Amino acid sequence: MRPSKRAADEMRAVSFERGVMRHAEGSCLVKFGDTHVLVSATLEERLPPWLKGQGRGWVTAEYSMLPRATHDRTRRESTTGKQSGRTQEIQRLIGRSLRSVTDLVALGEKQITLDCDVLQADGGTRTAAITGAWIALYDCLSWMRQRSMVKEIPLKDHVAAVSCGIYNGTPVLDLDYAEDSVAETDANFVMTGTGGIVEIQGTAEKTPFSQDELLGLLSLARSGVEKLVGLQKLAVG
């Protein structure tokens, strides 16, 4: 039995609230159960120096967590003078995931930055951030199209992410913190709406997992991403 009493293939309640930030070109408050992430999309005319003159744009991301997003207060990274390795890893993952479904040539020589701020953490913050960031990116690109900055929304597909793991010997979908903190195996899957795999991050916390177990988790993740993409489609109409 899972602590949340969910079925093994049951996700937490997922919701998207669009347009929650007045000044951002796109924004979304995404909730995976008690994990809440606020994502804002900012359009900028500047590009990284190494991209200038190449006729294409860039999509990048930043990730942070409010001090009391967690059970015990987490010190702000700005007070330490540097980002943790975890933060850098997550924001690079978010950026890679969004770029995988964005037509950067059609975007033109512009940069869109997705700021992902965790308001409350209960496991799966990176997967929620990726899934909500797609909504914020879509709204930013829609804003651009309305102003004739792009002819069409330069998105090639949806992208969403979900965690899977082995908890008490059972493969389960969308781990919350109570499961994630003691799971034998924990993995994150980033996939497109058409089923393409963008990234898999998997770790055996106790004993190594088998190829069959990995394929089982992949199947579970695919069903979860299909549900998330369906909710994204409903959210953007």
Curated annotation (Swiss-Prot):
According to the UniProt entry, what is the EC number of this protein? 2.7.7.56
The GO biological-process annotations, alphabetized, read as:
rRNA catabolic process; rRNA processing; tRNA processing
Q: Which parts of the sequence bind phosphate?
A: R86, G124, T125, R126
Tell me how this protein assembles.
Homohexameric ring arranged as a trimer of dimers.
Family designation: Belongs to the RNase PH family.
Q: What does this protein do?
A: Phosphorolytic 3'-5' exoribonuclease that plays an important role in tRNA 3'-end maturation. Removes nucleotide residues following the 3'-CCA terminus of tRNAs; can also add nucleotides to the ends of RNA molecules by using nucleoside diphosphates as substrates, but this may not be physiologically important. Probably plays a role in initiation of 16S rRNA degradation (leading to ribosome degradation) during starvation.
Protein name according to UniProt: Ribonuclease PH
